[in-house]
Amino acid sequence: MAANGSNVVSRGAVRFTEEQEALVLKSWAIMKNDSAHIGHRFFLKIFEVAPSARQLFSFLRNSDVPLEKNPKLKIHAMAVFVMTCEAAAQLRKTGRVTVRDTTIKRLGSTHFKNGVSDAHFEVAKFALLETIKEAVPASMWSPAMKGAWGEAYDHLVAAIKQGMKPAAA
């Protein structure tokens, strides 16, 4: 890990092929300008698949604001979606998940405190892949693109889980 708290997270080099990188970069280029809307759709899909996941978010627990209109959810969703996509886009070039050390530790700690489990990460992965599939042109989506985004997501989750360990919290 970098002593200056910058961009190093995962231990050891990540294997992410040129083809995977190209698929992620091509699709992210299409989604980037609409990341606020797409990120919000990503979270709405999470709550559609797992309504109880709302309880994991302090700003949603006692809120009467519909998810579609909740400004805090919109801000959070965009930040998470952009971070996920940017980390995926950098994976091959850097050989690791590139999210600030302090951010990944905070994410790990927050996810640990809120009781996020492997099942929650799987729901989020499903929702992410479905959201990306809906956001890119149908002719672009392929099993290879799904695999590239899935692998990138898995690397990000592995980095977050490192921060979820009690010793790291």
From Swiss-Prot:
Gene3D superfamilies linked to this entry: Globins
Keywords: Cytoplasm, Heme, Iron, Metal-binding, Nucleus, Oxidoreductase, Oxygen transport, Transport
Chief localisation class: cytoplasm
Details of cofactor binding: Binds 1 heme group per subunit.
InterPro entries recorded: Globin, Globin-like_sf, Globin/Proto, Leghaemoglobin-like, Leghaemoglobin_Fe_BS
Family: Belongs to the plant globin family.
Name of protein: Anaerobic nitrite reductase NSHB3
Source organism of the structure: Oryza sativa subsp. indica
